[in-house]
Amino acid sequence: MGAYLIRRLLLVIPTLWAIITINFFIVQIAPGGPVDQAIAAIEFGNAGVLPGAGGEGVRASHAQTGVGNISDSNYRGGRGLDPEVIAEITHRYGFDKPIHERYFKMLWDYIRFDFGDSLFRSASVLTLIKDSLPVSITLGLWSTLIIYLVSIPLGIRKAVYNGSRFDVWSSAFIIIGYAIPAFLFAILLIVFFAGGSYFDLFPLRGLVSANFDSLPWYQKITDYLWHITLPVLATVIGGFAALTMLTKNSFLDEVRKQYVVTARAKGVSEKNILWKHVFRNAMLLVIAGFPATFISMFFTGSLLIEVMFSLNGLGLLGYEATVSRDYPVMFGTLYIFTLIGLLLNIVSDISYTLVDPRIDFEGR
């Protein structure tokens, strides 16, 4: 197991490098970067001071149209601006350096977990990630916990009544829930229960109320649960299928084994066979899959659900950074997402070997 873990940990480095490198060069050839957006903001008069790296800015008063001819500029939005202004904007965002120099600087900074500062926010990228990460982790943990609390009893019941009408109908509903994307459930929940068209039972935005700090501790708990209900429901509704069917199939596999036949021949009751023998063995792989389920909820649920419910998590942070072309934040969130996913996959493999020593990854 030690050699396998070393190999997996060493594979994290080239995987991170490949993902960051591919996205870096894709972004370089994509139109509409931060310089283009800054130029557009100046031309349309949307900002008096445009924030740049280090919190400084470019004065719009220096960018009166009709000064100079910059038809040779690489930025299509800057045709009426002074070339010196465009050069200043380009310098502030670091795009005056060659692409290879920016690339290697980014790699060196990321090795040291130095993601720089946001282009459009007065904070470092690491600070923004630290503030946003707990929200995404909380959403993922709640979703995973509820999925386990529902899927395990449901899977056991489906195994006990295998082939019955309950099994058939529950399978149909599970498949339908699995096929419908989480964001569609989120829209339905908002329309029906968040003041859309019918009931106004739950808040639409945020994780806590505006007066959260002034509430007593018990009301803080209630307020938090009140806000998290709809986002968690939207995340978990489509997440029951895989774990429920895994639980059912694990039970059915155990029931067919020889030790169950022997226990029945000895006169052991079906209840004791189910809960004292089959349950313990069937739950090994189900429990070991907790990290993998959390990864699924963390990645698939964080982006769209956080955007739709305005939860200040890592998914919403990455989405807003992508829309505004805030490259340091965008690449920083991508780096953290990838690193967490790779490490949790390793934890998942370790948990499998802990609950079932027969699983051997050394032969891989």
Swiss-Prot record:
Keyword Glycoprotein attached: no
What is the topology of this protein in the membrane according to its UniProt annotation?
Multi-pass membrane protein
Taken from the record's topology, the Cytoplasmic segments are 30-37, 157-172, 246-284, 348-364
Q: Does the keyword Flavoprotein apply?
A: no
Entry GO CC: ATP-binding cassette (ABC) transporter complex, substrate-binding subunit-containing; membrane; plasma membrane
Q: Name one GO biological process term.
A: oligopeptide transmembrane transport
Q: Which cysteines are joined by disulfide bonds?
A: none
Where does the sequence pass through the membrane? Answer: 9-29, 38-58, 136-156, 173-193, 225-245, 285-305, 327-347
Q: Which residues lie on this side of the membrane: Periplasmic?
A: 1-8, 59-135, 194-224, 306-326
Subcellular compartments = Cell inner membrane
Where is each ABC transmembrane type-1 domain found?
133-348
The GO molecular function terms of this record are: transmembrane transporter activity
Q: Which CDD domains does the entry mention?
A: TM_PBP2 (cd06261)
Top-level taxon: Bacteria
Database matches in Pfam families: BPD_transp_1
Q: Per UniProt, which keywords does this protein have? A: Cell inner membrane, Cell membrane, Membrane, Transmembrane, Transmembrane helix, Transport
PANTHER family the UniProt entry points to: INNER MEMBRANE ABC TRANSPORTER, INNER MEMBRANE ABC TRANSPORTER PERMEASE PROTEIN YEJB
**Chain's role:** Probably part of a binding-protein-dependent transport system. Probably responsible for the translocation of the substrate across the membrane.
Q: Which family does it belong to?
A: Belongs to the binding-protein-dependent transport system permease family. OppBC subfamily.
Q: What is this protein called?
A: Inner membrane ABC transporter permease protein YejB
* Originating species: Escherichia coli (strain K12)
